[in-house]
Amino acid sequence: HLLNVKIGMTFSGGVIDFLLFGVLPNRTAWWLVIPVGLVFAVIYYFGFRFAIRKWDLATPGREKTVEEAPKAEAAAAGDLPYEVLAALGGKENIEHLDACITRLRVSVHDIGRVDKDRLKALGAAGVLEVGNNVQAIFGPKSDMLKGQIQDIMQGKAPARAEEKPKTAASEAAESETIASPMSGEIVPLAEVPDQVFSQKMMGDGFAVMPTDGTVVSPVDGKIINVFPTKHAIGIQSAGGHEILIHVGIDTVKLNGQGFEALVKEGDEVKKGQPILRVDLDYVKQNAPSIVTPVIFTNLQAGETVHVNKQGPVARGEDAVVTIR
């Protein structure tokens, strides 16, 4: 306005607007924009550079790193539930505590008291925050953590988590083929409407948009986890890979309605054997999505997931995915 330069713009005020509304009509002193822009560029650069260094602002790439040592110490001492509760702001900060097979779901009174960096140092693969709700991605041990934290809040000594030796995929096997657990359509993880899966916080894998409600084992192996609400099942393959089949999104809230488990923990299963029945119509009506992520939670360094098929797939169809 001071220089009487008048150039219109649509959305971004970028170079296209500059050309269309300034240079081409040639009805205003558009050339003055260039020296003014250069002056502001210098002001912005040195102004923000000074502010960032003066007040140590956490711009991308300059975030403070979190020490990882406390993670091992807490786990070794059996104090993980106490540490997690403290990182959530303590007993008095907890409004509601819940969990599913992937994460702790916590409503808190004061989100400012939640130490997200500490939760990550304690083993959370990620921490999601929406309003006063926190989701800490602790994987299959989330439900055990929930029970232990509830015991602490009630003044009881928490039950010790059963120490299960960590399973490593067999180094002898060069690769392992995975069958589709459901009929439907193969969907990339990136398209799953839950960032815990789409951002691979629990591991790599694939997803199926199912067309019928029978779930079969994608491998020969052993059932290692059947979640109480039956919406998710963990399997250890003969090759040592741990596989999580999570039917639908936010289906933990259905409290088992629409799900019938056909196996129990410890059962040996064969590839293609039915392990779960799902009332898809009920789940469609009561959950955000029926898309079913299949996650490999213990991939070793250098192992990659290769999705060999796109589009329609049949339940039990072999080699839709290869791990190698």
Curated annotation (Swiss-Prot):
Catalysed reactions listed for this entry: N(pros)-phospho-L-histidyl-[protein] + D-glucose(out) = D-glucose 6-phosphate(in) + L-histidyl-[protein]
Keywords, in A-Z order: Cell membrane, Kinase, Membrane, Phosphotransferase system, Sugar transport, Transferase, Transmembrane, Transmembrane helix, Transport
Annotated segments matching region Disordered: 156-177
GO biological process, one term: phosphoenolpyruvate-dependent sugar phosphotransferase system
Residue ranges occupied by any PTS EIIA type-1 domain in the UniProt entry: 194-298
Recorded GO MF terms: kinase activity; protein-N(PI)-phosphohistidine-sugar phosphotransferase activity
Compositional bias per record (Low complexity), positions renumbered to this chain: 167-177
Keyword Kinase: yes
Enzyme active site: 100, 246
Gene3D superfamilies per UniProt: Glucose Permease (Domain IIA) (2.70.70.10), Glucose permease domain IIB (3.30.1360.60)
Coiled coil, from the record: none
Transmembrane regions: 5-25, 28-48
Membrane topology: Multi-pass membrane protein
Record bears the keyword Secreted: no
Domain (PTS EIIC type-1): residue spans on this chain: 1-63
EC id: 2.7.1.199
Location in or out of the cell: Cell membrane
Main location: membrane
A cellular component term, taken from the record's GO annotations: plasma membrane
PANTHER family noted in UniProt: PTS SYSTEM GLUCOSE-SPECIFIC EIIA COMPONENT
Domain-related comment: The EIIC domain forms the PTS system translocation channel and contains the specific substrate-binding site. The EIIB domain is phosphorylated by phospho-EIIA on a cysteinyl or histidyl residue, depending on the transported sugar. Then, it transfers the phosphoryl group to the sugar substrate concomitantly with the sugar uptake processed by the EIIC domain.
Functional summary from the UniProt entry: The phosphoenolpyruvate-dependent sugar phosphotransferase system (sugar PTS), a major carbohydrate active transport system, catalyzes the phosphorylation of incoming sugar substrates concomitantly with their translocation across the cell membrane. This system is involved in glucose transport.
Record-given protein name: PTS system glucose-specific EIICBA component
UniProt source species: Geobacillus stearothermophilus
